[in-house]
Amino acid sequence: SNETKQSSQQSSEKKETTKTHTFVNKSNSGITSTLIYTVEGDNVIKQSANNIADPEILGATPEDVKSFIEEKYKGYNGLKGVKQTIEIKDGKVVQDLEVDFSVASISELRKALPEEYSGIGNRVSFSNSKKALEKMGFTEKTN
């Protein structure tokens, strides 16, 4: 029937239902964080983070900052659905992180990084995330 055709088309064309929200935090001296949430309804389906740390402002060497970030986020290493790179670029330390919640296990993420993934259940709520981000000093960028 036509109806089943339409619904299977919709699921392959995710662009209609997903929205992207970008949050930026410059309130921590020496660190600029940009988070991009891909959201379907209230469910976060993907989260990307780009953190740029300026060692000069932080009063440390790029190598020290890099190892601090590696240590702090080592819980992400080896988790399925998670891609992370931490590198020194032009004297700054750049962390890129992508979490695909359709693949990642939220209980694993919680175990690895409890302070980053609070709450219960096996989904990430966008409205809860947004509140938490605003408390941390993030502001949503509107296009």
Model-derived features: positions:
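N-terminal, intrinsically disordered, polar/charged segments of Gram-positive cell-envelope systems
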Residues: 1-20
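Domain-level marker for long, solvent-exposed, non-transmembrane regions
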Residues: 18-19, 44, 126
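A cross-family detector of function-defining hotspots
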Residues: 23-28, 85
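Mature, soluble, non-transmembrane domains
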Residues: 75, 79-143
